[in-house]
């Protein structure tokens, strides 16, 4: 018997982000495939890797120590390190992958004859790539794991290799779940983190060619991100008249919430590839809008504003910071520039004489955690709205385009007048 949808009780007090609620939806338990497809998703770069590396028996034996459904692209890494003549290599990865860091370190030291440095600081996303610290540690090469090429390799201080760590999952169960929960011919926006990007394009092709129950999957794109890729601060604006629902593939809600904030009128679902649960997700857009409006209103009366540049890797953008400083000063507002690697309520509470803060780091810090600070903490977009240099949001649209081609995260000044 198919399980009935069960609504989780919405929390009355928001304590950590606007988590909202979720409900479970139908899953095809009978069609479970017990083992994931272990075929590696290999790019065209494989053709460029010398055969002596691809066929190195000792190297391939060492690679077997890593999980078979995680593609750490060891062959490509070895080839790039050798090709660039690197001597000291930094390895940067999110906390969830640090368990594999020593195995990778040993492999690279043995087969590349280099010294490796495992960077232990937090890495929340591609914006946190820390080539500055790597260079300070005398590294001449850095491998950044599990995130896309958000920061171009031609502007970093040392050579960079991005390894997406694509993960193979049980595609058939995901396909069966989508077919069970949506009507034939449905147009669905499907996206996820970069790890599951190959899966998204694979199931898109299979469902579009499914004669029994054809589905039309659309991997939305926000340039310059990949099709089907979503970030916690950057997602595509979708046409609610064309898209029946949004499906996010990944664990957690952080990235999905970006699309939910950007498209509050489109139903959202999440498929967790680890638990294989398919849930309908909810976000309290109204409450978020009210909290952000209050923050901007209070900050508009500020005489002294703390302008924070995020120093966690390349999270902060100096161009955006300088642009905000110029506009604030032109309004007669005193500016105090602050550099912080991580922004905590306790730390900002020490600045007693500052009336409000604007952080050029991660917009989700303000959206998710703004209520926890004793003074307003605005994003660059909210600050520009306050200064009447950008169009204000409304209940059906709050832009999530921070790292888009023309976004504030790239030092640009986007124009939202045509979408709000």
UniProtKB/Swiss-Prot annotation:
GO BP terms: protein histidyl modification to diphthamide
Binding site for [4Fe-4S] cluster: 127, 233, 362
One Pfam family from the record: Diphthamide_syn
The keyword Iron appears for this protein: yes
Cofactor note: Binds 1 [4Fe-4S] cluster per subunit. The cluster is coordinated with 3 cysteines and an exchangeable S-adenosyl-L-methionine.
Catalytic activity: L-histidyl-[translation elongation factor 2] + S-adenosyl-L-methionine = 2-[(3S)-amino-3-carboxypropyl]-L-histidyl-[translation elongation factor 2] + S-methyl-5'-thioadenosine + H(+)
Metabolic or biological pathway: Protein modification; peptidyl-diphthamide biosynthesis
Subcellular location: Cytoplasm
Main location: cytoplasm
Gene Ontology MF, one: 4 iron, 4 sulfur cluster binding
EC number: 2.5.1.108
Quaternary structure (record): Component of the 2-(3-amino-3-carboxypropyl)histidine synthase complex composed of DPH1, DPH2, DPH3 and a NADH-dependent reductase, predominantly CBR1.
Protein name (record): 2-(3-amino-3-carboxypropyl)histidine synthase subunit 1
Source organism (scientific name): Debaryomyces hansenii (strain ATCC 36239 / CBS 767 / BCRC 21394 / JCM 1990 / NBRC 0083 / IGC 2968)
């Amino acid at each position: 018997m198919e399980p009935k949808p069960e609504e989780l009780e919405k929390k009355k007090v928001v304590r950590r982000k606007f988590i909202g609620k979720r409900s479970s939806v139908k899953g095809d338990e009978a069609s479970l495939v017990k083992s994931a497809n272990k075929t590696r998703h290999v790019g065209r770069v494989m053709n460029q890797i010398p055969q002596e590396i691809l066929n190195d028996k000792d190297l391939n034996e060492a690679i077997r120590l890593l999980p078979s459904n995680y593609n750490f692209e060891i062959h490509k890494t070895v080839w790039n390190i050798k090709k660039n003549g690197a001597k000291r290599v930094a390895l940067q990865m999110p906390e969830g992958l640090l368990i594999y860091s020593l195995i990778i370190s040993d492999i690279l030291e043995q087969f590349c004859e280099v010294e490796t440095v495992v960077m232990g600081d937090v890495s929340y996303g591609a914006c946190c790539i820390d080539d500055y610290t790597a260079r300070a540690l005398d590294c001449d090469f850095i491998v950044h794991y599990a995130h896309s090429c958000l920061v171009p390799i031609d502007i970093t201080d040392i050579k960079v290799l991005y390894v997406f760590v694509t993960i193979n999952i049980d595609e058939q169960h995901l396909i069966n779940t989508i077919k069970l929960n949506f009507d034939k011919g449905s147009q669905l926006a499907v996206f996820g983190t970069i790890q599951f990007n190959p899966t998204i394009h694979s199931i898109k092709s299979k469902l579009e060619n499914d004669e029994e129950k054809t589905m039309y999957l659309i991997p939305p794109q926000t340039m310059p991100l990949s099709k089907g890729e979503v970030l916690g601060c950057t997602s595509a604006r979708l046409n609610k008249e064309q898209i029946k629902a949004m499906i996010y593939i990944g664990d957690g809600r952080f990235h999905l919430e970006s699309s939910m904030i950007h498209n509050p009128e489109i139903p959202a679902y999440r498929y967790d590839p680890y638990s294989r649960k398919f849930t309908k997700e909810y976000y309290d857009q109204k409450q978020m809008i009210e909290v952000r409006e209050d923050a901007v209103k209070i900050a508009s009366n500020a005489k002294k504003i703390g302008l924070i540049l995020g120093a966690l890797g390349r999270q902060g953008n100096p161009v955006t910071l300088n642009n905000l400083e110029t506009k604030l000063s032109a309004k007669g507002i005193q500016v105090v520039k602050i550099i912080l690697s991580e922004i905590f309520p306790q730390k900002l509470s020490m600045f007693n004489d500052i009336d409000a803060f604007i952080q050029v780091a991660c917009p989700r810090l303000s959206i998710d955690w703004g209520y926890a600070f004793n003074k307003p903490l605005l994003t660059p977009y909210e600050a520009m709205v306050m200064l009447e240099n950008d169009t204000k949001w409304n209940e059906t649209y709050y832009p999530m385009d921070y790292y888009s081609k023309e976004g504030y995260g790239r030092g640009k000044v986007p124009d939202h007048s045509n979408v709000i």
